[in-house]
Swiss-Prot record:
One of its GO terms (molecular function) is zinc ion binding. A zinc finger (C2H2-type) spans 197-220, 287-310, 406-430, 440-463. This is Zinc finger protein 512. Transmembrane segments: none annotated. The keyword Oxidoreductase does not apply. May be involved in transcriptional regulation.
Length: 567
């Protein structure tokens, strides 16, 4: 550059004193001096004001005493001397192109980023955002599948038309299985049998294997096929019945002539033992009470009767006790202690809680009703119900499927029911029809009831002590019975004490003579106290104890206040 502009070239080494002095003189003559300091990595321009002296402007451009001219000044030093960093934007780069600032090469930035990860974001000014991925679903178009082409007049075409029309096609071999696709139908036809499936228990024939499995589970309780000499294990049988009960909600009797169904395993097993047997066989199965001879057809009924009526004493001798009652022996403990009344009440409440837990486990199951003995059915009479033909029943069932309700067929009656059984019960008591039904009658007290639920509630509440089953309705009657027994025992104790007192008064000894003089008040109090102590002591003794003869009794004279005189 020319000396007229006052530009001073930056030298790598220290400048001599004369050269520095000449530059100061040239810079003082110019109104505005432009000073450029070059370095290997940075370049900037310093503007000067006219008010500043030449010495001050020159001192800002020249290097410090021993440091080279290419020394890079700090930003704090530039701010203190009113040097703007934006002035560097007017300086041309090494290639002659003006740039805002010289950036570091890529290699140095990578090294800085390794040491300081946040530095890279500061250099670029903002974080790098991930590129938005295009949605593949938006680009792809939905291609509608063309209907498969089948030969004209073929079976596949007929099946396809039937699927389009009805939604499914049935198997031409068994006519019991339907499929929604032709591939599924072909796969089924490979395994489909033309022969019918036959039930091994009742001989009924069905077309599908699934129908046969349901038939065996519903009608035969999934009874396995037994060979000659094989027996059913009791735990496995209970597990099998439990699975059937969970799936269907009830257990049906397997006899063809019996249509009974049960909602508990215990009730079902109790029914199976007696179903189909004659009166003679049932008579042999009865269990009679050893004390009163009352017959019971279940162990639980006899056990409850013995606990409530005869107490926890042994009801059979050791040698004559039958095998069926050995497992429920109610003898006293090894110590010989008889069960207390409070323990009996506790056992009763425990049984009540256990029955409540069973009812919670299966809400629809009538556990207590299944345990009722057979003679309970004879405690009340049922009136005759009207009979209906199969056509009428089929019509009612179809009406329920269509309209979900049935109306009473009698003229003038607007009763509506959602089940056939409800309509049957209503027709037995409907007064607008031609059928005249009787009433339910209790055989224990000859009381009549309109509904079956009424007579059952009456038997459970009034005649509850006759049953071994503990129902929630019998709780109050049982508590009353226990209170009455407790009062009777207390009255008997009072009567015994009264009798003992009367006997003591009669047994007063005639040899005791009272003094002629009237005793003082203190003597009378002592006599009364001694007399009361004597009564209490005798009342504590057993009333059956024999009285002591008078000749062995010691005669005690009453105490007096008179002092013995000297003879």
């Amino acid at each position: 550059m020319s000396s007229r502009l006052g530009a001073v070239p930056a030298t790598p080494g220290p400048t001599p004193f004369k050269q520095q002095r000449s530059t100061r003189i040239v810079g003082a003559k110019n109104s505005r001096t432009q000073c450029s300091i070059k370095d290997n990595s940075f370049q900037y321009t310093i503007p000067h004001d006219d008010s500043l002296s030449g010495s001050s402007s020159a001192s800002s451009c020249e290097p410090v005493s021993d440091f080279p001219a290419s020394f890079r000044k700090s930003t704090y030093w530039m701010k203190m001397r009113r040097i703007k960093s934006a002035a560097a934007s007017h300086v041309e780069g090494p290639g002659g192109v003006s740039t805002k600032g010289k950036r570091k090469p890529r290699q140095e930035e990578d090294e800085d980023y390794r040491e300081f990860p946040q530095k890279k974001h500061k250099l670029y000014g903002r974080k790098q955002r991930p590129k938005a991925q295009p949605n593949p679903k938006a680009q792809t178009r939905r291609i509608r599948k063309e209907p498969p082409a089948y030969a004209a007049g073929s079976l596949e075409e007929q099946w396809y038309l039937e699927i389009v029309d009805k939604g499914s096609v049935s198997c031409p071999t068994c006519q019991a299985v339907g499929r929604k696709t032709i591939e599924g139908l072909k796969k089924h036809m490979e395994n489909c049998k033309q022969e019918m499936f036959t039930c091994h228990h009742c001989g009924k024939q069905l077309r599908s294997l699934a129908g046969m499995k349901y038939h065996v589970m519903a009608n035969h309780n999934s009874l396995p096929i037994l060979k000659a000499g094989d027996e059913i294990d009791e735990p496995s049988e209970r597990e099998r019945l439990r699975t059937v009960l969970k799936r269907l909600g009830k257990l049906r009797c397997m006899r063809e002539s019996c249509s009974s169904s049960f909602t508990s395993i215990m009730g079902y097993l109790y029914h199976v033992r007696k179903c189909g047997k004659g009166a003679a066989e049932l008579e042999k199965m009865t269990l009679k009470c050893h004390h009163c001879g009352k017959p019971y057809r279940s162990k639980a009924g006899l056990a409850y009767h013995l606990r409530s009526e005869h107490g926890p004493i042994s009801f059979f001798p050791e040698s004559g006790q039958p095998e069926c009652l050995k497992d429920m022996s109610l003898e006293s403990k090894s110590g010989g202690r008889v069960q207390r009344r409070s323990a009996k009440i506790a056992v009763y409440h425990l049984q009540e809680l256990a029955s409540a837990e069973l009812a919670k486990e299966w809400p629809k199951r009538k556990v207590l009703q299944d345990l009722v003995p057979d003679d309970r059915k004879l405690k009340y009479t049922r009136p005759g119900l009207p009979t209906f033909s199969q056509e009428v029943l089929h019509k009612w069932k179809s009406d329920i499927k269509k309209y979900h309700r049935i109306q009473c067929p009698n003229q003038g009656c607007e009763a509506v029911y959602s089940s056939v059984s409800g309509l049957k019960a209503h027709l037995g008591s409907c007064t607008l029809g031609t059928f005249v039904a009787g009433k339910y009658k209790c055989l224990l007290c000859q009381k009549e009831f309109v509904s079956e639920s009424g007579v059952k509630y009456h038997i459970n509440s009034v005649h509850a002590e006759d049953w071994f089953v503990v129902n929630p309705t019998t709780t109050k009657s049982f508590e009353k019975l226990m209170k009455i027994k407790q009062r009777q025992q207390e009255e008997e104790k009072r009567r015994q004490q009264h009798r003992s007192r009367r006997s003591l008064r009669r047994r007063q000894q005639p040899g005791i003579e009272l003094p002629e003089t009237e005793p003082s008040l203190r003597v009378g109090k002592d006599q009364r106290r001694n007399h009361e102590e004597l009564l209490v002591a005798t009342s504590r003794k057993e009333p059956e104890q024999e009285p002591v003869p008078t000749q062995f009794q010691k005669v005690r004279s009453p105490k007096t206040n008179h002092k013995r005189g000297k003879k």
